[in-house]
Structure formats: C-alpha cells, structure tokens
Amino acid sequence: MISKINGKLFADMIIQGAQNLSNNADLVDSLNVYPVPDGDTGTNMNLTMTSGREEVENNLSKNIGELGKTFSKGLLMGARGNSGVILSQLFRGFCKNIESESEINSKLLAESFQAGVETAYKAVMKPVEGTILTVAKDAAQAAIEKANNTEDCIELMEYIIVKANESLENTPNLLAVLKEVGVVDSGGKGLLCVYEGFLKALKGEKVEAKVAKLDKDEFVHDEHDFHGVINTEDIIYGYCTEMMVRFGKNKKAFDEQEFRQDMSQFGDSLLVINDEEIVKVHVHTEYPGKVFNYGQQYGELIKLKVENMREQHREVIRKEQHTAKPKMETVETAIITISMGEGISEIFKSMGATHIISGGQTMNPSTEDIVKVIEQSKCKRAIILPNNKNILMASEQAASIVDAEAVVIPTKSIPQGISALFQYDVDATLEENKAQMADSVNNVKSGSLTYAVRDTKIDGVEIKKDAFMGLIEDKIVSSQSDQLTTVTELLNEMLADDSEILTVIIGQDAEQAVTDNMINWIEEQYPDVEVEVHEGGQPIYQYFFSVE
C-alpha cells in the first residue's frame, strides 16, 4: 500500500510514465486517423513527456510541490503538436494543485487529476469529445469517486487505468471518424501509456526500455555547435569522447540508470544507447581516460573516439575572421513563420518574414523553439504564422508566455501562410494586422499531394498503402496508384469557374515529368486560370496547391 507520494516517488512515476510512452510511441502513431506520413501524435507526446522527464532528472526534489513545478516547466517548454500541448496543460493543472504540498495522499492525487482536466479544457478553444480530453476527464472523475473509499494510491491508480481504458475504447462512439477508420483515439492511448507507467512506479516496478539492435560500426555524428561560446577558454569540457563497450560475461552487470548517473559525473552532453550486447556512449568531458576506464568495468572497449573541441573552436574562429558574419537580426516587429523546405523559406523571406523556424509535419517545433526566436529577436511585437494545424497550440502557448506583445495568425497550411503574409502592412498596428491577416486565411483554398502509409477507408475514400492521396485542407478527396491521375482529380475538386489564380509549390520528391504533364493539363482544362509555379523543396508532400 502507498498512502503518500513525495517528490522522490513522483519523479519515478514521471520517469516510468515517460519510458512507457516512449516504448509505445510507434503504436500511438499508428492510431492516427489520417494515413499521411507524419505519425505525429505518439512522436509529439513522447518528445513533450521526455522534455518534462529530463527537467525532473536534472532538478530532483523530495518536495512534490517543487518537483511538480519543475515537471510542468519542462512539459510547457518542450510541448510539440496539439497532443503535446494538451498533455502539458493536463499536468500544468495537476502540478498547480500540488505546488504548496511536500507530499500528497490519494484524495489530493485524484483532485489533481481533476484540476488538470479543467486546465486542459480551458486551453483548447473548441474541445472535442472522443479525444485525449475525454479519456483524461473520465479517468479523473473515476479517481474522485474512488478516492472516497481508498487511501491506497496504488488501488486508486489501478482504478484510473481501468476507467481510462474503458473511456478509450468508447472514443469511436463519440467521434465518427474514429469509428470509420476503426481505431481508438491516439492521444487518449498515449495518456493511458503514461498512467500505466505511473502505476509501475507506485508498485516499485521499472518499465524497461525497448531493446533495439545497435549498429556497431557507427558512432554518433556530433556536429559541435559553438553558438554563444565567445572564448575558447569558456568551453568547460574540452573533449568530445565516444566509446562502444561489448559486455563481458565476467564483468560488472550493466544497469543503465546507474551507468548514466556515474557517467554524468564526467561531463555533459551525455548520450547512452544500449542493447543486449553493447553500449554506445557519447559525452563531453575533460578526462577521456576516466570515461574509458569506467567503461572497461562492463566489458571490452571495441571502438573509441576523442575530438578536441577547443581546437575545433579555434578553427571556427580562424574561419570567421576571414568571413563576414551577419549579426542576428533584432527588429521592432518580428514576423515568425514555420516553414518546410528551402524554397518555401525563401518565399517567406522575400515577402518580409524576419525569422524562419524549420518545421512541419514530421517535426513540429516546440513551444521553447518559438519562444527562443522571439526572445533572441529582442522585438516589442511578434506575429507568428504556424502554417500547420498541429503547430497552432504550441504557437499560442509561446505567445502567452513571452514578454513581447505576440499574436498568432491561425494559418493551417503553407498556402494560408503565404496569403496571410501578403496582407501584412508595415504601417498598421499589431491588432489591425492580426485582423486582416487572419481574414485572408478564409479566402484561400489549400490542397496537397502525398502518399498513404497504410490501408484505410476515410471520408468515403478507399486508400491503399503507398497510393497517392489528394487532400483539400484536411479532407482526402482522391487516392490512386497513379500520381498524375490523383493530382488531376484533386485539382478538379479545387478549381471552379470563378477561380483566378492557382499556385503550385513543388516538393523535393516531385517528378519533373509529372509536373510538366500536370501544367499542360491545367492549361488545357482551365485556360482562364493563371498558374504560378514555385520550387518549395518541401519533404513528404510532392505538391502544395492554393486557389484564389
């Protein structure tokens, strides 16, 4: 029985919850409704939870209130994607409820889950049932009921998991698209994974990391970033040190947590990856020999590498002395756009964007990524263009915590971002620009072409794995094995008699022959439509389209 949870135990709950989510991230990704190759829910929740875990591991406290503040900060700044932001808000409310406590009982644990739900619902502009919010709400309500007749936090957590699982299984009955595709909600599944890890910790058990076979021929390719290091002497740990150790039968038994703790004493930038046979280590240290000696306790050293980072920094300085380096741009009003592909970034820059953050479907920038750009620009005002529905909440979260006056234009696609930026008026106020830029989003129809990562049926369209898919906004309107056929079906849905301009943004995987045939087809079928073609260089999507 566990009647009280202190900071030490809560830290272990967080660590085991994060590990269980990490182990199941691919499974959560596979539950995404749309078969586009982004797999964002599991990935984003995992990265968000990992950020919280790392903050906790670096700032351990026996006081649960203090630890909760640390955890909440890590989640807030590391939140990626809408699922990650919602996860961060669930635990923001949870941790706020325990901030004055040194330890909590089952009743306060239940109340904190409920406080998290209330915070998360307030953070979402239009809450949708049948999602992670529903699973969290049902689990919290069950916790409140159960806490009335048990003081055992283990028993409470077991009941929470039972009810969360029941809620998860019911999500297809609340959200029609889940039922059509035949899956449960991916975010709800991710949350359940975290709760299951919590229970493991309460029982004194450990979630083992998934074992993956390691490539014994490859080291970590560490490109050292010296931004912010002015003098070579400022580098505290001067040697980038890497080793591979093959475990020996008569050597010390390998325990990853103990290994990490011991290795962390030698320096920073620690990375440890292991399987049943070997462990790979990367660390920045002053004493490479001590690292190697420590590794020999566990087995045979099979590969070693040491690089002198101070010498590398001296070389960087020598090169920079011969190359004019532009200063980081500071502006009164920062226009920050999220972009994918060099060509698209150049389009945004040419239209007046002051700062570009690389990101998109496969890698949503975190709240912290956006905050850093705003802070480094030293701007008084900031306009953020997410250009992706899954980056919208992280953008809003960033805007809410910076000192600058910041607004988010709700652009959900690259074409919408371009249209909004076209409306920016340097002489207008921030609120005037926000209004006219947001209004322009409604005047553009966005489309895209990509491929399917699995078989499914959605929006009444049969989709086969690896087939091409044409989407208008988020709706799949065409899917064929032939790329040109899919494109023409998509454009027939997008174009109308009153369409004036069609913009085509070409991705890095587009084939020139398909592009040429597509342009010829457009000119034949829609001779009155003006066609603008740009090289975008975006991954995942062969084409982006916009119609005005």
From Swiss-Prot:
Q: Would you say which domain of life the source belongs to?
A: Bacteria
Q: DhaL domain: which residues? A: 8-200
A GO MF annotation of the entry reads: glycerone kinase activity
The scientific name of the source species is Staphylococcus aureus (strain MRSA252)
What InterPro entries does the entry give?
Answer: DegV_domain_contain, DhaL_dom, DhaL_dom_sf, FakA-like_C, FakA-like_M, YloV-like
PROSITE patterns for this protein: DHAL (PS51480)
Give the residues annotated as coiled coil: none
Concerning Pfam families, the annotation shows: Dak2, FakA-like_C, FakA-like_M
Instruction: Name the Gene Ontology biological process terms.
Output: glycerol metabolic process
Please report the name of this protein according to its UniProt entry: Uncharacterized protein SAR1202
